């Protein structure tokens, strides 16, 4: 399952202001959403980035294809998106997916925001994490694709696996770096430089 991918990892302890995800719009269904306040342990704010050159797709086109079927960039031998609620076609706010993974890693999520160049998911009750994750693309000296997450562990066992044993953290790293590589393939371009992963670990009271 594991492979060598050129990447640069930066990890920081941060005692400053808590990085917060964007607020949910008033019309977003909050039922079963597992927000940061329901989480356990520290807050992890993570950014995964890759720059793509010589690709054949615009930022808008990339997001449109992924919204139609996230599995076009998912490492489907390891993880697969299954739509549980919503119509086929492009993502819409309120659609729900189960990210099916081996072992205890299955993750139910709901679409809480979409734009022409981004979409954002919130974790639902039963997910190993509590928080949100956003996928976005924009054209900046090539095509920059980013995945940004704001999350705490969903329960004490998840916190042990993620923060203490680091097992879940490495599974997550593999998942999202694989998605970035999938985006590169989707565009038929080439990755410029290394994939970068930045992690801020923030202590949360309570």
Language-model features: locations:
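Hydrophobic ligand-binding cavity/cleft-lining segments
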Residues: 1-100
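A conserved amphipathic terminal alpha-helix motif
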Residues: 154-205
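Beta-strand/loop substructures that line and gate deep hydrophobic ligand-binding cavities in soluble
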Residues: 126-170
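Beta-strand secondary-structure signal
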Residues: 47-49, 98, 120, 134-136, ...
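Short, flexible segments with low predicted structural confidence
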Residues: 33-38, 108-109, 147, 151
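Short, intrinsically disordered, mixed-charge
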Residues: 64-72, 126, 181, 185-188
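Hydrophobic/basic alpha-helical segments enriched in Actinobacteria
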Residues: 78-81, 121, 178
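Hydrophobic-ligand binding "helix-grip"
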Residues: 100-140
């Amino acid at each position: 399952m594991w492979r060598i991918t050129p990447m640069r990892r930066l990890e920081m302890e941060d005692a400053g202001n808590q990085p917060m995800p964007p607020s949910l719009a008033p019309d977003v269904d909050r039922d079963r959403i597992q927000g940061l306040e329901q989480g356990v342990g520290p807050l992890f704010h993570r950014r995964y980035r890759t720059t793509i050159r010589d690709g054949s797709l615009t930022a808008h086109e990339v997001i449109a294809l992924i919204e139609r079927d996230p599995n076009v960039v998912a490492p489907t031998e390891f993880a697969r998106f299954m739509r549980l609620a919503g119509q086929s076609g492009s993502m819409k706010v309120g659609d729900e997916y189960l990210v099916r993974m081996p072992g205890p890693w299955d993750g139910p999520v709901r679409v809480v925001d979409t734009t022409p160049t981004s979409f954002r998911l919130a974790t639902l009750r039963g997910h190993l994490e509590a928080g949100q994750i956003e996928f976005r693309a924009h054209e900046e000296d090539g095509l920059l694709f980013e995945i940004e997450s704001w999350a705490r562990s969903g329960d004490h066992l998840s916190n042990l696996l993620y923060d203490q044993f680091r097992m879940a953290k490495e599974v997550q790293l593999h998942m999202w770096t694989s998605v970035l590589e999938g985006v590169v393939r989707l565009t038929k371009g080439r990755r410029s430089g290394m994939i970068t992963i930045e992690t801020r670990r923030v202590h949360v009271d309570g």
